[in-house]
Amino acid sequence: MSEKYLIFGATGSVGSNLAEQLKNSGYDPHLVARNENEVKTISDKLDCTYTVADVLEDGFIEKIKTDINDIKGIAYCIGSIDLKPLRMISEQDLNKCMKLNLYSAVEAIKGYQESLK
């Protein structure tokens, strides 16, 4: 069995290209994305597994772990920035940005830390 790698943000250009490179190198990517139609299309093309999950929702790691437990690595290819003047940025904007770009990545690593040792 080839080594499994979780690819978060697998429907974006970085995530989908990384998944394709891993597959072509003999690894087994497991795709994670929030849009089922898009992730299924990529999964079918690469012949790999996937989970539909939104990293902004509580319990997203538990949802993914129902599909895959043992992994070799994680690629967190999710990111966004809210470009607007500082005077217009609210605390809610900052919290959402931190949750998407940092906290969810930390949760993913924590959720799979035993497998990653």
Where on the chain are the PLM-derived regions?
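N-terminal Rossmann NAD(P)H-binding glycine-rich loop of SDR-like oxidoreductase domains
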Residues: F8-E20
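Conserved NAD(P)H cofactor-binding loop of Rossmann-fold oxidoreductase domains
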Residues: C77-L83
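Substrate-binding pocket helix/loop in short-chain dehydrogenase/reductase
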Residues: P85-L86, D93-M98
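Rossmann-fold cofactor-recognition segment
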Residues: S43-G59
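Conserved glycine-rich Rossmann-like NAD(P)H-binding loop of the short-chain dehydrogenase/reductase
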Residues: S25-V39
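Conserved Rossmann-fold cofactor-binding substructure of NAD(P)-dependent oxidoreductases
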Residues: L56-D70
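A short, exposed helix-loop element centered on a Lys and neighboring polar residues
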Residues: I109-K110
